Each structure stands twice: as structure tokens, then as C-alpha cells.
């Protein structure tokens, strides 16, 4: 990884899962910001320089879809990974998440690989710039 340390925002209302992902991502050299609710996650997203988001689908209050929708509205190019206990991809998530993983089945190394891929894909995409200035 380059000299810039990527920041990953993890959002989950279940503390054990949140801490496991925090330790996993920090061990790989990422800076991790944790939020314990969708609303807290949105606040953190707005106040921190976040490079990617890993969030739980099923949270009380604001679920993962609502959080992903708001993140897409605020900063459309942010990579989003949604974790869910449910294996089926819901139609409403299409276009909101870059990756959908079934919670509990993924190996920790697999999550790291996928986070790295999301960040690499983002880095290789041309960054959306301001609209061209027509003189």
C-alpha cells in the first residue's frame, strides 16, 4: 500500500462484529472509524475523510440500504460493501452497494481482499471532476 493510509468506515449496531472488523482492517494497515448506528455512520461519513464503507444491512433505526442511499447522495464514488445475514440480493440494493457479502460465511482474509479491490477499483477510475468549463 502507498504512503496514504485509507480510512474505512464500519457501521454495525452489533458491537462484536464491529470490533472484529475493526481489528481485521487495522491489522491490514487501514485507519478505521466505527459507528454503532446508521445515523452515527452518516455523521462520521460527513466529518471524516472516508475512502470506503463497510456496513451491516440489518440495523435498528436506519438500515443499511438507507445509509448506502445517503452515502451515494453525499459522495457517489465512495465504495460501499454491505454485509447481511441474508444471502439474496434485494432489488433495492442494486446500484447502492458495490459489493454484497453474506455475513458469517466470509473469511476475514476475503473481506480484506474485497476492501482492497474496492479501493483499487476506485483509484483506477477517473475521478469525477467539476463540469467542463466552456469558454
Predicted features, each with a name:
Residues 1-7, 109-135:
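Non-catalytic signal-transmission and effector/linker regions of two-component phosphorelay proteins
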Residues 5-16, 21-25, 53:
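Conserved acidic segment of CheY-like receiver
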Residues 15-19, 90, 108:
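Charged phosphotransfer/docking patches of two-component systems
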Residues 34-43, 64:
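Helix N-cap/capping motif at the beta->alpha junctions
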Residues 43, 65-76:
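Short amphipathic alpha-helix used as the core "switch/output" element in two-component signaling
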Residues 56:
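Active-site residues of response regulator receiver
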Residues 59:
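Receiver (REC) domain active-site loop signature in two-component systems and cognate sites
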Amino acid at each position: 500500500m502507498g504512503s496514504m493510509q485509507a480510512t474505512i468506515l464500519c457501521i454495525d449496531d452489533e458491537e462484536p462484529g464491529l470490533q472484529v472488523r475493526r481489528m481485521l482492517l487495522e491489522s491490514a494497515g487501514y485507519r478505521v472509524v466505527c459507528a454503532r448506528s446508521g445515523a452515527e455512520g452518516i455523521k462520521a461519513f460527513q466529518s471524516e475523510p472516508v475512502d470506503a464503507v463497510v456496513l451491516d444491512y440489518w440495523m435498528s433505526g436506519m438500515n443499511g440500504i438507507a445509509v448506502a442511499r445517503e452515502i451515494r447522495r453525499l459522495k457517489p464514488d465512495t465504495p460501499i460493501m454491505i454485509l447481511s445475514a441474508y444471502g439474496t440480493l434485494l432489488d433495492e440494493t442494486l446500484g447502492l452497494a458495490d459489493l454484497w457479502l453474506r455475513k458469517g460465511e466470509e473469511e476475514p482474509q476475503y473481506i480484506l481482499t474485497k476492501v482492497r479491490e474496492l479501493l483499487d477499483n476506485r483509484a483506477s477510475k477517473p475521478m469525477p471532476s467539476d463540469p467542463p468549463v466552456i469558454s
